[in-house]
Regions:
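N-terminal cap/lid segment of alpha/beta-hydrolase-fold proteins
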Residues: 1-53
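Short substrate-entry loop that stabilizes the transition state in hydrolases
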Residues: 48-55, 61-113, 215-216, 240-241
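Structural motif
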Residues: 56-57, 205
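Glycine-rich His-Gly loop
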Residues: 60-65, 186, 211, 236-237
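Alpha/beta-hydrolase active-site loop
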Residues: 115-170
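Primarily recognizes the serine-hydrolase "nucleophile elbow" in alpha/beta-hydrolase
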Residues: 153-226
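The feature captures the conserved acid-bearing segment of alpha/beta-hydrolase catalytic domains
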Residues: 205-265
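C-terminal catalytic histidine-bearing segment of alpha/beta-hydrolase fold enzymes
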Residues: 232-234, 257-306
Length: 306
């Protein structure tokens, strides 16, 4: 396994950076299509911790409207608090005893090859209010529906490949393949949902931070059949308009088909919020976003191994 290792925080987790997990096409519609490496960073639990039978794993993808962000940093601060980057979630959960992976994936400005198995039911119905804002911030012209769809499809392909790579290397990484959770923030969370529910990548749990599945994709891909993993869905009270609409729709549809979903509508925040953000008060529930993830993973991954 190639990559560069470093100790992230004194005696804390060790990070192996720049590990290639796949190669995939970019410049897809040009006269000069190319392949580029896809890389991930691995956050290993501290050497003081021990795991019998392999560690649980957490694979996370960054947010950025399928346009920007990276596996090292996807922080944004707009009109309020900034989000905790997925790399920091990886560090924190590695210190709890998870092997964590912060993954790279192809973005819309790279003109990615979308693959041959679409996950989107109706590409013309993809909400794009945030995407259009980000393109203006990046001084890019408006994107066509095809460009947007290709980027979303490519991200799902890449996340699926990352899950496959972790599973194929589970023994070498001391990962328990029955306890692999996936997730991400915003576009990363949506890509995790696409990989698991539309492309049938095998995972034991999904953590979706202000991501979603479109209504059409929910109806086609989420059936509640055995093998579909439980989902943790979190979103802000003042989140993006389509997230506020689609996240509750996931909860409703999941309830109808029997898919276990744990949902938290986070009071007083928009799309960007730190891990320390307080949840709605509850007598016996988690206090913060980070605690909600911790409780969900502890519960679902323990059941997956049982």
């Amino acid at each position: 396994m190639d990559g560069q290792s470093s100790r992230a925080n004194g005696a804390g987790c060790k990070v192996t950076r720049d590990v290639e997990y796949s190669r995939a096409g970019v410049r897809f519609t040009s006269d000069d299509p190319r392949q580029r490496p896809l890389r991930l960073d691995i956050y290993h639990p501290p050497v003081t911790l021990r795991a019998a039978g392999g560690w649980p794993a957490l694979i996370l993808a960054f947010g950025g409207a399928f346009h920007r962000g990276s596996r090292e940093d996807d922080t944004v601060q707009e009109d309020g608090p900034k989000n905790t980057p997925v790399a920091e979630y990886c560090r924190r959960f590695a210190e709890r005893g998870y092997v964590c992976f912060s993954i790279d994936y192809r973005l819309i400005p790279e003109d990615p090859d979308p693959g041959t198995i679409p996950v989107l039911v109706n590409p013309d119905n993809v909400p794009r209010s945030r995407l259009d804002v980000v393109r203006r911030q990046m001084n890019l012209p408006p994107a066509t529906s095809e460009m947007v769809a290709n980027g979303i499809e490519a991200a799902a392909v890449d996340f699926t490949a990352a899950i496959g790579w972790v599973r194929a290397n589970a023994v070498r990484l001391a990962v328990d393949p029955s306890r692999i959770a996936v997730g991400g923030f915003s576009a990363g969370g949506r890509s995790a949902m696409h990989a698991v529910f539309a492309r049938q990548a095998e995972a034991a749990a999904v953590v979706c931070l202000s991501g979603y599945l479109g209504l059409d994709e929910l109806k086609r891909h989420v059936s509640g059949l055995p093998g579909e993993p439980p989902v943790l869905a979190l979103w802000g009270e003042n989140d993006l308009d389509y997230v506020r609409e689609q996240a509750p729709a996931l909860v409703e549809h999941a309830g109808a088909v029997g898919l276990p979903v744990t949902a938290h509508r986070i009071p007083g925040v928009g799309h960007f919020y730190p891990a320390s953000t307080a949840l709605a008060p509850s007598a016996d529930g988690p206090a913060t976003v980070e605690h909600a993830i911790e409780a969900f993973l502890a519960s679902t991954l323990q059941r997956a191994r049982a």
